[in-house]
A protein has these predicted regions:
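Binding-site signature for planar aromatic cofactors or substrates
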Residues: 1-149
Length: 149
């Protein structure tokens, strides 16, 4: 069934326009300005970002995850290396991030190559995880060990 009324749903965006004279030439500096603005707006899930990956056959896949940090070297998120996204990134490390902040009438798209953080950084992050998350992750590791032999 086609919903014809969807064609008529349209919102007028009036908060801000994107004018090149108002944008910092350094994309990381501009992202930081917008990110700080977003944090002040008290969004429900301020660090939510959509990660889009593709298999080596080019089949796309997208999911929402949480940004853990960013600086001029890149944007950091964590994932199980053996998850679908982990496997896709291992065979094709090209990906994109999409921040969508409808309350601010803004979205930011970032494209690039994904690389693993150091083992030390990964372990440091794992220690900050809630207990239940650590248990689930440990269970996944044990499952892999049991099925690997």
């Amino acid at each position: 069934m086609i919903h014809k009324e969807l064609e008529n749903i349209r919102r007028n965006y009036k908060l801000k326009s994107l004018d090149t004279k108002d944008v910092d030439l350094n994309p990381f500096a501009q992202f930081n300005i917008w990110f700080e603005e977003m944090l002040k707006s008290n969004l429900i899930e301020p660090t939510a970002v959509i990660l889009a990956t593709a298999s080596k056959q080019g089949k796309p896949s997208a999911r929402t995850l949480l940004l853990k940090s960013y600086d001029e070297t890149g944007f950091v998120f964590y994932s199980n290396y053996e998850s679908k996204k982990g496997n896709e990134l291992a065979e094709n490390n090209n990906a994109s991030l999409l921040f969508y902040w409808p309350e601010l009438e803004r979205q930011i798209r970032i494209e690039g190559k994904v690389e693993k953080v150091t083992q030390k950084e990964s372990e440091k992050y794992f220690k900050t995880r809630p207990f239940k998350s650590k248990v689930v992750h440990g269970h996944q590791i044990n499952q892999r060990l049991l099925t690997a032999g």
